[in-house]
């Protein structure tokens, strides 16, 4: 029995499996083991939200409170206090890394955040070729999940924690003709008196001890090729033609 084997031999279990499986395993593991889940089973903090976005009932609701939604650079030492470490989705990782520090510091306006994200087709899962069988996957750029992509739920949940629910954010993902990598372009309005240099400085200070997040020089043009096949994330802050508005580019492999 797989669950008995885990309980007997493991202190830590890392699961990269379809949504739903980690819920079942968590029922048997948590007395002596820590579960790191790469799927979405414990990303949302309410069973009702999981049902809404993933169209299936959560089978381990009592274990949700034992889990933490963990971007390591954000949660830091907090993960030691939880038995389930829930890894964020790919898009939310590229979006929350720049936004959380800037919102916490009160540097940006929260009522008009626009996010345009592009991902390699590996992010669409193993069934991507069947799903897009009528399209030329390698010669096409496709928007999908417009307005209602599942990752909206994670992004909204984590932003609400630091804004008390007062924000407006639009997120649109796109599938690109490359295998892997993400580039998220985030359009942000600055608070009065805040400059591009202030943004870069605050991000640099926030991530100065984090080896995988690099804040680039202002107006640096970025490419997914800069981080491909690494664990790195690059953040670039660029001016726009409008006063008090910046464009933040984020790439992750």
Where are these regions (language model features)?
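Single conserved hydrophobic/aromatic residue that forms the stacking wall/gate
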Residues: 1-10, 14
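N-terminal glycine-rich "phosphate-gripper" loop used for MgATP/nucleotide binding
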Residues: 15-19
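Rossmann-fold NAD(P) dinucleotide-binding segment
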Residues: 21-37
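Rossmann-fold NAD(P)-binding glycine/threonine-rich loop
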Residues: 39-79
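Short beta-strand->loop
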Residues: 82, 86-89
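Active-site-lining helix/loop region of Rossmann-like oxidoreductase modules
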Residues: 93-219, 242-249
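FAD-binding beta-loop-beta segment adjacent to the flavin cofactor pocket
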Residues: 220-247
């Amino acid at each position: 029995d797989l669950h008995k084997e885990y309980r007997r031999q493991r202190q830590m279990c890392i699961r990269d499996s379809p949504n739903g499986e980690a819920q079942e395993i968590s029922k048997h593991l948590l007395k002596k083991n820590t579960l790191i889940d790469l799927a979405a089973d414990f990303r949302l903090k309410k069973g009702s939200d999981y049902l809404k976005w993933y169209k299936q009932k959560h089978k381990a609701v009592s274990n949700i409170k034992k889990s933490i939604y963990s971007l390591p650079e954000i949660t830091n030492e907090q993960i030691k206090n939880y038995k389930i470490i829930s890894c964020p989705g790919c898009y939310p990782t590229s979006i929350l890394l720049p936004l959380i520090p800037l919102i916490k510091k009160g540097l940006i306006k929260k009522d008009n955040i626009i996010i345009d994200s592009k991902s390699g087709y590996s992010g669409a899962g193993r069934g991507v070729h069947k799903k897009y069988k009528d399209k030329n996957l390698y010669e096409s750029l496709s928007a999908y999940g417009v307005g209602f992509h599942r990752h909206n739920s994670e992004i909204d949940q984590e932003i609400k924690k630091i804004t008390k629910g007062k924000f407006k954010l639009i997120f649109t993902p796109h599938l690109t003709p490359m295998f892997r990598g993400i580039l998220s372009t985030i359009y942000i309005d600055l608070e009065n008196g805040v400059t591009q240099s202030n943004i870069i400085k605050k991000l640099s200070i926030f991530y100065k001890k984090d080896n995988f997040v690099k804040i680039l020089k202002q107006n640096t043009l970025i490419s997914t090729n800069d981080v491909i096949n690494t664990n790195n994330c690059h953040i670039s802050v660029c001016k726009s033609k409008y006063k008090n508005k910046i464009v933040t580019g984020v790439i992750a492999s």
